[in-house]
Amino acid sequence: MAHKKGQGASRNGRDSESKRLGMKVGAGQRVSTGSILVRQRGTKWHPSQNVGRGRDDTLFALVDGIVVTKKTDRTYISVLPE
């Protein structure tokens, strides 16, 4: 056992708080207007029909309905009204 901490040991031990990004609702789930569908940095998922995009690229539902994802060259998320 070392009787001294060693160089740099006192400078370690930090980590950033997780930002809880990602899909908040899965495909096929029912959502209400204003529900957050995805939290993201940049546009990993793109808004399609009845989906809005916030300043921080958050996707949210513009109508009540069911979430649908579609993957082509990009992944699109839409909400089909009920």
Swiss-Prot record:
InterPro entries, per the entry: Ribosomal_bL27
Q: Does the keyword Ribonucleoprotein apply?
A: yes
According to the record, the segments passing through the membrane are none
Q: What is one term from the GO cellular component aspect held by the record? A: cytosolic large ribosomal subunit
Query: Listed GO molecular functions?
Result: structural constituent of ribosome
The record's annotation in HAMAP family points to: Ribosomal_bL27
What NCBIfam families does the record point to?
Answer: L27 (TIGR00062)
Indicate what this protein is called per its UniProt record.
Answer: Large ribosomal subunit protein bL27
